[in-house]
């Protein structure tokens, strides 16, 4: 099968995130498929962007053909919108060229925003290919709720037209969000066209030796000093979206539990607010450590007894979430306290932790106490449920196969 993957923000191991298109495409190439990914030369998500001198510049990455369209750099909203519109227009204008060169059997529109569905469908029609819309976030609902845009804003109205266009014409919707089907149907998607393919993991990155890698001396010294205590851990970015401040405030509530210690590993703009709470409350039951490379996350997580994953209040979370950090914790057999407004989340479905309301410090503290008061064996049994679920259901090889099944019948 020839697969054309349109992903404005596509990344790679060299450039950084976004990784999902790379991992799926790598598995498809292994299975004998031909994959072309079209992306923009500029993305705010990448660690570094490719040097692109002209449109349709090509690059081979692990057997995947990357095709770059030149895009303007951006920081603010206006220049980002210009970047989006330029990318979509170049696809639309060159649809015949792309169809002839790629000869796709399947066209995937996957650029977060829905406007790339218009050129994706055109290319599919010119090629006689199937066409699917891959949903990462629900647009334009996400920028409306997060950015405060009115539904009458011209940008939002254009994006709403793009979303509705996709649901009307698509052969299938592939969603990272497990509970988004009702929303899609409300906007016009026909019955039987919704498939959930969440984010996955690469087993090669989680071999047992990863857990034994040497971590920085500063980190090892802290963990050595906490032997005998129940460690509640978080490893990741200190951003407002992760609502780590609620975990810090839970440490305030549990400061008299001398058997429980909080360890946070990371960096980010919210760090000063955490340090302020720690200083004001004279906390001795929490330690903040510098971030570590992604390769050391298993070796860090193995020292935790309980993991925390949080979010802010958002109705968007009711449609489902797809946190890579969740998978990391589950692969480490950690029981999870998930403070996200996601009823029926994987934590609840699998039974690998406790889900509570987002930003509810008392509920977070109570969940931690409940897990801390379990025996070590009980916590490990709970954590193993998560690991077994991920290993069975979320290898990229399986997800890549599941992705193509609806288009191979």
Pin down the residues of each PLM region:
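N-terminal subdomain of nucleotide-sugar transferases
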Residues: 1-64, 254
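Conserved donor-binding/catalytic core segment of Leloir-type glycosyltransferases
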Residues: 4, 225-251, 263
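Carbohydrate-associated surface elements
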Residues: 41, 179, 200
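Membrane-proximal helix-turn-helix segments that form the acceptor-binding/catalytic region
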Residues: 96, 115-118, 122-127, 153-175
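A short, well-ordered alpha-helix in the C-terminal region of glycosyltransferases
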Residues: 124, 377-392, 405
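Nucleotide-sugar-dependent
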Residues: 242, 293-330, 337-348
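Nucleotide-activated donor-binding/catalytic signature segment of Leloir-type glycosyltransferases, i.e.
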Residues: 265, 272-299
């Amino acid at each position: 099968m020839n697969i054309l993957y349109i992903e404005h923000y596509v990344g790679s191991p060299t450039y950084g995130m976004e990784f999902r298109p790379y991992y799926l495409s790598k598995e498809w190439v292994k299975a004998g498929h031909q994959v072309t990914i079209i992306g923009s030369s500029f993305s705010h998500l990448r660690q570094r962007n490719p040097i692109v001198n002209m449109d349709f510049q090509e690059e081979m990455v692990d057997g995947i053909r990357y095709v770059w369209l030149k895009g303007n750099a951006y920081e603010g909203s206006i220049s980002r919108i210009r970047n989006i519109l330029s990318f979509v227009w170049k696809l639309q204008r060159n649809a015949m060229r792309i169809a002839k060169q790629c000869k796709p059997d399947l066209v995937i529109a996957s650029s977060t925003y829905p406007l790339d569905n218009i050129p994706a469908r055109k290319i599919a029609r010119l090629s006689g290919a199937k066409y699917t819309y891959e949903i990462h976030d629900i647009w334009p609902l996400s920028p409306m709720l997060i950015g405060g845009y009115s539904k009458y804003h011209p940008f939002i109205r254009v994006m709403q037209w793009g979303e509705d266009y996709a649901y009307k014409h698509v052969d299938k919707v592939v969603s990272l969000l497990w509970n988004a089907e009702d929303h899609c149907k409300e906007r016009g998607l026909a019955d039987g066209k919704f498939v959930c393919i969440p984010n996955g993991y690469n087993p090669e990155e989680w071999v047992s030796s990863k857990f034994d890698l040497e971590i920085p001396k500063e980190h090892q010294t802290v963990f050595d000093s906490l032997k005998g205590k129940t460690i509640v851990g978080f490893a990741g970015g200190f951003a407002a979206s992760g609502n780590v401040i609620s975990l810090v405030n839970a440490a305030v509530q549990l400061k008299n539990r001398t058997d429980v210690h909080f360890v946070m590993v990371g960096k980010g703009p919210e760090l000063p607010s955490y340090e302020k709470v720690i200083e004001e409350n004279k906390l001795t039951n929490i330690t903040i450590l510098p971030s570590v490379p992604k390769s050391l996350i298993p070796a860090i997580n193995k020292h935790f007894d309980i993991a925390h994953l949080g979010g802010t209040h958002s109705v968007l979370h009711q449609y489902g979430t797809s946190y890579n950090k969740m998978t990391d914790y589950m692969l480490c057999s950690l029981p999870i306290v998930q403070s996200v407004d996601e009823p029926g989340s994987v934590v609840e479905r699998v039974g690998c932790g406790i889900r509570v309301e987002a930003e509810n410090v008392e509920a977070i503290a109570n969940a931690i106490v409940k897990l801390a008061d379990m025996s070590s064996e009980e916590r490990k049994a709970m954590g193993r449920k998560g690991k077994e679920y991920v290993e069975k259901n979320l290898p990229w090889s399986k997800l890549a196969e599941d992705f193509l099944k609806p288009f191979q019948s």
